[in-house]
Amino acid sequence: MHWWADPWWVNLLALVPFLVFFYWRRKPLEISGKLLFFAGCFAVAFGFVEASVVVYLRGALGVLPGIGGTLADVARLSSSLYQQSYTLDQFPKSLMAVETVREAATMLMLASVAFLSASRWRDRWAVFLWSFALWDITYYASLRITTGWPMSLNDLDVLFLIPVPWTARVWFPVLVSGLTALAVVLGRMPNLPMEAPVASESQNL
């Protein structure tokens, strides 16, 4: 049992929230709370849509004799599918190609929202990370509510397929996404420089 992400370089993503936080603290982000709210609404809604796609896909792959393809069946199958690495070893090759393109399209949609929401690249990057973080957290929360998976944060998941499959325990993307969202919020806060005390008139006499 490995506790960290694979391939090894995926673990470097844990540095992202800390790096962007210190970068943004040098010059706070110029993103309004209203922008973050609506970008967050999009991300949460999109996260549920993403989870729904996975639910439908599992249901379709689980349509076998004795299985009705219902939500209850999907919930029953979810754990065993991941424990057996079903999504990598037995996933139909034709659907794997579609899934890879779908992942790329997902990133393009999140990037497009960020590009349209801000004019400066640093603010666009912040909106992208904010949207991605909320999308990712909502994705796992929606799967948990609808299918009962993940049963714990230690469950193994396939995060992405581009350029190669990324695998990690669920706690890894949830933690990184949570810290990234926090970094964006803190990155909006203005710096408060220490002001030198002003001498009183009596001291100047």
Please state what every model-predicted region is.
Residues 10-11, 35-39, 100-103, 124, ...:
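Residue-level signature of transmembrane alpha-helical entry/exit and packing/kink sites
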Residues 11-21, 105-114, 168-187:
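Hydrophobic cores of alpha-helical transmembrane segments in multi-pass inner/ER membrane proteins
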Residues 22-37, 53-64:
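Membrane-interface helix-loop junction between the first two transmembrane segments
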Residues 23-29, 186-197:
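Membrane-interface capping segments at transmembrane-helix boundaries
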Residues 47-60, 133-151:
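Transmembrane alpha-helix/helix-exit interface in multi-pass inner-membrane proteins
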Residues 1-15, 93-96:
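Hydrophobic transmembrane alpha-helical segments in integral membrane proteins
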Residues 54-100, 152-170, 174, 178:
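Extracytosolic (periplasmic/ER-lumenal) interhelical loops and adjacent juxtamembrane/interface segments
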Residues 28-44, 117-134, 197-204:
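Interfacial segments of alpha-helical transmembrane regions
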